[in-house]
Design a protein with these regions (language model features):
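Extended terminal accessory/targeting regions
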Residues: 1-175
Length: 175
């Protein structure tokens, strides 16, 4: 087992014209404990932490903590799938997909779609991944990530029919 970690730095998001909706400005990449790498693409629309207000109150606000885990979870909830990167961390660095921008932030350039795979995910898997992704930030206290993990148990949005993901629009806001 490897350490799980975010391979990209904190989120940069842009507010949409809709209340509580944001677009990711950068690709976000997470390496899970088994070495699997997941991508949440730039242009993805999110509402950050979608948890009941009472859970947020217990956990100390929805926007106080690193929001990258919520984006990964939102993607899984919207499509019932995740984007798996079919490259290793060292390959991503070697081919300059994982790099630093001029401000010194770790970023991920657009990975070609032939190096990506859409994989099915169950609600349980998505919720457990959410907790691991929160834990890996190393800034979200355990009481918060455990509370938020319990909160997503009540996410009945999963029961909606999932959207179909279109790889031809992966890095756009048209998804």
């Amino acid at each position: 087992m490897e350490d799980m970690m975010w391979l990209t730095d904190k989120s940069r998001i842009q507010q949409t014209n809709e209340a509580n909706n944001w677009y990711l400005l950068d690709n976000e990449v997470f390496e899970d404990e088994d070495g699997t790498i997941y991508l949440t693409p730039r242009g993805f629309k999110t509402d950050n932490y979608t948890i009941p207000d009472w859970v947020a109150w217990i956990g100390g606000s929805k926007s106080k903590w690193d929001v990258r885990p919520s984006h990964l979870h939102d993607f899984a909830c919207e499509y019932h799938k995740l984007i798996k990167v079919k490259m290793t961390k060292s390959s991503l660095k070697r081919y300059k997909y994982l790099t630093e921008n001029k401000e010194g932030m770790k970023v991920c350039e657009d990975i070609p779609t032939n190096c990506l795979e859409l994989v099915d995910v169950t609600k349980w898997e998505a919720d457990c991944l959410f907790k691991r992704a929160m834990k890996s930030t190393k800034v979200i206290p355990s009481r918060v990530y455990n509370t938020f993990r319990c909160g997503v148990f009540f996410n009945f949005g999963w029961l909606k029919k999932p959207k179909i993901f279109d790889f031809s629009k992966i890095y756009t806001k048209e998804q």
